[in-house]
């Protein structure tokens, strides 16, 4: 009997598929998607996404479909229960965070407050 442990943040199938495509295009299998939170934006905090080859001490990693999502401990506290997703819509294609901790979110979804 196995017990599944819920991860503090989820990585959607769409986000994992897009990361896999981008990593393949760069021909660098060591690249990982790093999501982070910084001060700024119209709501106080903003999400950031970058590709990174390294994992720092204390970082959380989530693997899905052979790709890795990395979150630093400071950002993780604002992202617990969230979902990193990738959307392709009228506002363009982008990674985003569906964050249950956000009390307000700006119109584009790039910044939030808690």
Curated annotation (Swiss-Prot):
GO terms for cellular component: cytosol. Gene3D superfamilies: HesB-like domain. The keyword ATP-binding does not apply. PANTHER family: IRON-SULFUR CLUSTER ASSEMBLY 2 HOMOLOG, MITOCHONDRIAL (PTHR43011:SF1). Homodimer. Belongs to the HesB/IscA family. NCBIfam families: iron-sulfur cluster assembly accessory protein, PRK13623.1. This is Iron-sulfur cluster insertion protein ErpA. The gene is erpA.
